[in-house]
Design a protein with these regions (language model features):
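Hydrophobic pocket/interface hotspot
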Residues: 46-49, 80, 95, 106, ...
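Intrinsic-disorder/low-complexity, polar/charged segments enriched in Ser/Thr/Lys/Arg/Asp/Glu/Gln
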Residues: 30-38, 67, 79, 90, ...
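Bacterial N-terminal signal peptides that target proteins for export
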Residues: 1-8
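Short beta-edge strand/loop motif at the mouth of beta-sheet-based domains
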Residues: 53-92, 101
Length: 164
């Protein structure tokens, strides 16, 4: 019950807080997007809600059509995964660094980027502020895509901004 209250509080705070999103760098071989919001929650509660990805990720941006099938195992080499049934599933990203309630880093190509010759580094930072926590979500992507990666920067920024 406490976890559900934390998640609900996180989601309500996000809905009420002004968010900031920007593609900070773009080139044919990659891009960086940064999304940030201040939530009315402690870093521990913000962290707990963030790693409960199945509770807040949009079902529109899943393979299964059901965000409840999404999960993050917040340990080194843990999985940001989506279950597709009894034995089927997708590894969207792999956890590469964990500092609970402070930072979570994942590596891989999210969504259609996972089908291309690219790699990404996604970092979620949690910083205590007066009255809440600043959640900063940075995703840097580089590699090869026919026609150039710059065309993916806007759509990826939109999806991540919608999630945050």
């Amino acid at each position: 019950m406490h976890m559900k209250k934390a998640i609900l509080g996180f989601l309500l705070a996000i809905a009420a807080a002004p968010a900031w999103a920007e593609v900070t760098d773009v080139a044919p071989n990659g891009f960086t997007t940064v999304n940030e919001v201040i939530v009315e929650a402690t870093p521990v509660h913000a962290w707990t809600a963030a790693i409960s990805v199945g509770e807040w990720w949009s079902s529109d941006h899943t393979i299964s059509g059901d965000a409840r099938r999404m999960s993050i195992e917040p340990v080194t080499q843990g999985c940001f995964c989506e279950s597709l049934g009894d034995t089927a599933g997708v590894v969207h990203l792999v956890v590469t660094s964990v500092m609970p309630a402070t930072m979570l880093r994942l590596t891989g190509g999210l969504g259609p980027l996972g089908l291309m010759g690219v790699d990404g580094n996604m970092t979620w930072d949690f910083e205590a502020t007066d009255g809440g926590t600043r959640v900063r979500f940075t995703y840097a992507v580089g590699g090869y895509m026919k026609g150039g990666l710059e065309q993916m920067a806007g759509p990826v920024d939109f999806v991540l901004g919608e999630a945050l």
